[in-house]
């Protein structure tokens, strides 16, 4: 896969944050702190003075430079009506439907709840570790809630790095193929307690009134202290009412997390909305051992929280609940069923009303709870506090970043600053520049060469994957391509 196909701005990234109580409180205190550079020797303040807080924990911005603009004057249908039946990765969308982030930065949002990985690494029992890993897998998609803007499709060779010394990890990603679009990422704990890596290439489908992103690619988490590896894929994400009405998102599908050392599995069911919206955002699942004996039950909402309880207590509660439901059902009549059509030109689907909270079963254990979003989130593309900081470009960072880092993309920067005309012009320029570069490689019969990842097979599943080749943080960027 050399990415030598024609350049298109793909509708990718509909694919992939959180406080809790007790032991999770420390994660909340540092949610606004970020460090983006390990090369402290190259960073300095005025007169060459070192910045304060040598541990790299710094307070970053809490708002974007400009508020989000209205999309009310733009019609998705005017574009999509010409493309029914086509591969969505080849549809050029106007910048009005973007959010000011690259898909590589969207992937980085997996790390907002990295404290759950650290917690798993510190736990002595495999069952407890699987609980924390499952909570991390659910939390990794939580930032997508109400995020209806499309991230910018990464250019071939684009990269993004993030170092959070306060959260104990560093992260690097690269766009390794353009068509099909494939984004590879690698993260590791600064204390060498974990490795987290994968490659993402969503399959997109247009269903008339909705766009569905089916995840492709394996996600792998290695807990080095325990010599354990966990693998899974993300649930399917669907954006409804792309033609008419209020946009809303749901995630659905089965996520199977495998512990390749013990044989334990966690099966998580991200439930579809259903006819009356009762199941919207709900997640249910269980952990089983290699003999398929259920060890633990989990339930919650990917937009809110995840709880767990032992199977016996769960079954007892469900039996009592069922008896109560049967008594209530005899007194209720839900009326005629609602028609469910997905034909272009029909009226918009009603946005289902989710139940406000999760009913907590007595004796349950809280595994994860989402962070509150900043009060101005709705004016910032519904970004979380973690997300708001991802594209911030600190003074002097250009000296340590490679020229391919997406913080340096002028179209994303223009949109973030509220200059939509500039952003659109730069987007078109970058697309044309990449087309010309592809043509030049074709003339010279030269294949694209990735810098930081190489194609291979996942060491645990055997599936095709892109593996981190190392050396990025040595910061030799002399042969990086000029893509901007």
Swiss-Prot record:
Keyword Glycoprotein: no
Family annotation (InterPro entries): OSBP_sf, Oxysterol-bd, Oxysterol-bd_CS
Modification Phosphoserine occurs at: 19-20
Protein name as annotated: Oxysterol-binding protein-related protein 2
Record-linked Pfam families: Oxysterol_BP
Membrane topology of this protein: Peripheral membrane protein
Molecular function terms, GO-annotated: cholesterol binding; cholesterol transfer activity; phosphatidylinositol transfer activity; phosphatidylinositol-4,5-bisphosphate binding
Compartments in which it is found: Cytoplasm, Cytosol; Lipid droplet; Cell membrane
Any coiled-coil regions, as ranges: none
GO BP term, pick one: regulation of presynaptic cytosolic calcium ion concentration
Function per UniProt: Intracellular transport protein that binds sterols and phospholipids and mediates lipid transport between intracellular compartments. Increases plasma membrane cholesterol levels and decreases phosphatidylinositol-4,5-bisphosphate levels in the cell membrane. Binds phosphoinositides, such as phosphatidylinositol-4,5-bisphosphate. Exhibits strong binding to phosphatidic acid and weak binding to phosphatidylinositol 3-phosphate. Binds cholesterol, dehydroergosterol, 22(R)-hydroxycholesterol and 25-hydroxycholesterol (in vitro).
Gene: Osbpl2
Residue sites binding a 1,2-diacyl-sn-glycero-3-phospho-(1D-myo-inositol-4,5-bisphosphate) per the record: 90, 178-179, 431-435
Transmembrane segments: none
Family: Belongs to the OSBP family.
């Amino acid at each position: 896969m050399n990415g030598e196909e024609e350049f298109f701005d793909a509708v990718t990234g509909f694919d992939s944050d959180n406080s809790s109580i007790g032991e999770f409180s420390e994660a909340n205190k540092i949610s606004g702190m970020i460090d983006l550079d390990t090369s402290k020797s190259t960073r300095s303040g005025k007169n060459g003075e070192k910045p304060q807080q040598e541990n790299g924990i710094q307070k970053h911005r809490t708002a974007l430079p400009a508020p989000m603009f209205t999309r009310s004057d733009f019609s998705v249908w005017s574009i999509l009506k010409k493309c029914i039946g086509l591969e969505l990765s080849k549809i050029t969308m106007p910048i009005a439907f973007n959010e000011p982030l690259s898909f590589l930065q969207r992937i980085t949002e997996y790390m907002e709840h990295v404290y759950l990985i650290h917690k798993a690494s510190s736990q002595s029992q495999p069952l407890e570790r699987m609980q924390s890993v499952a909570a991390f897998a659910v939390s990794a998609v939580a930032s997508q809630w109400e995020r209806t803007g499309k991230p910018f499709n990464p250019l071939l060779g684009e990269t993004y790095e993030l170092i959070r010394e306060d959260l104990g990890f560093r992260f690097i990603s690269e766009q390794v193929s353009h068509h099909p679009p494939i984004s590879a990422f690698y993260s590791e704990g600064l204390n060498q307690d974990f490795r987290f890596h994968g490659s993402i290439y969503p399959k997109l489908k247009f269903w008339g009134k909705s766009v569905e992103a089916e995840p492709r690619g394996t996600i792998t988490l290695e807990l080095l202290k325990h010599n354990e590896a966990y693998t899974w894929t993300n649930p399917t994400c669907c954006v409804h009412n792309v033609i008419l009405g209020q946009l809303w998102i749901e995630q659905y599908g089965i996520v199977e997390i495998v512990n390749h050392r013990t044989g334990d599995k966690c099966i998580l069911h991200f439930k579809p909305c259903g006819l009356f919206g009762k199941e919207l955002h709900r997640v249910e699942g269980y952990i089983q051992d290699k003999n398929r004996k259920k060890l633990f039950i989990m339930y919650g909402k990917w937009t809110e929280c995840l709880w767990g309880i032992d199977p016996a207590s769960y079954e007892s509660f469900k039996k009592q609940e069922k008896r109560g439901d049967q008594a209530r059902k005899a007194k209720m009549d839900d009326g005629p069923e609602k028609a469910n059509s997905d034909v272009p030109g029909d009226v918009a689907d009603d946005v289902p009303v989710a139940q406000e909270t999760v009913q907590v079963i007595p004796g349950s254990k809280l595994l994860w709870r989402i962070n509150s979003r900043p009060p101005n989130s709705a004016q910032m593309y519904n970004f979380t506090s973690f997300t708001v900081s991802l594209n911030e470009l600190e003074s002097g960072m250009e000296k340590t970043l490679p020229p391919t880092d997406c913080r340096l993309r002028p179209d994303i920067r223009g949109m973030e600053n509220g200059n939509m005309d500039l952003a659109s012009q730069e987007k078109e320029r970058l697309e044309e520049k990449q087309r010309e570069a592809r043509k030049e490689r074709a003339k010279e019969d030269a294949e694209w060469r990735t810098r930081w990842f190489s194609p291979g097979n996942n060491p645990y599943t055997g599936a095709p994957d892109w593996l981190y080749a190392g050396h990025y943080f040595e910061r030799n960027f002399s042969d990086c391509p000029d893509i901007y």
